[in-house]
């Protein structure tokens, strides 16, 4: 929960007794309250590196995991968590290079002392955590440089023994399963990434680099719903960045596709289909951001701006925890309302609710399809 006064300044010093949490109008008992104090990204100047860059090209990138929190561990306290997620299956090589260059620029020029950055990649049917949350610029830049050059090209050994094991990669569905169940692989991978980050109680921003994301029919609505719900439950906001940037499209498509032919070339139907397809590829990015509290960066060439926007949005906030008094597994949306128990005049920004679990008897056909798909993973 972000609590600010009328001037936009964070209000500090509040406790659980100062908040009122209601779920569908029913008051809930707050069991946990913690304040995360972060300097505003606008006022926190980027930290200049104290030593020259020492960038290495690894022969093999390590596959690791997001380190879970342990009792008494204050590693993530008062830190801003940014996960850079590169969907290599959704970007052609030129877009991949633009996305990686934007990440390099952010790390070199915009990263502050409060930032911890993680690097994730989706490729080959698995979500790989290439680097856990860290503030070490050289390690971050080395991983990104290796992604640009390509694994197997460098001479430096990875510093992590896990680079030669497959324990760090979260299994994803293969092509045959996706063809059978008509499931969008990018959304399923995003759901996996959100659940990985859900081990941490702090607010997380997942910056999602992709060249659009287009649904393949009504069946994928169930997967979209599941991905958004997983992000909300995990405290993750999606910040999609369209790696294509500002695109000037040829009316009938570029040279990568054959001429459409037929009367559509002359009536404008073919040109309309190209434009509609491009817009639909951005609609899902917009929905992912809007439903999780993030913002999509579309039609903009400076991709670094999308990361900076995710960074600047996260300021000081409170973490509230409670056990719901509603045990019904009906799959319905439960609206949350948070207010202050005192006479303070403040603006509160928080997640508006979540979807409850659902019993099998209430599953739709799409839900049953997703459950069968999960069982085959």
Q: What are the roles of these predicted feature ranges?
A:
Residues 1-377:
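Scaffold/interface architecture of coatomer-like assemblies
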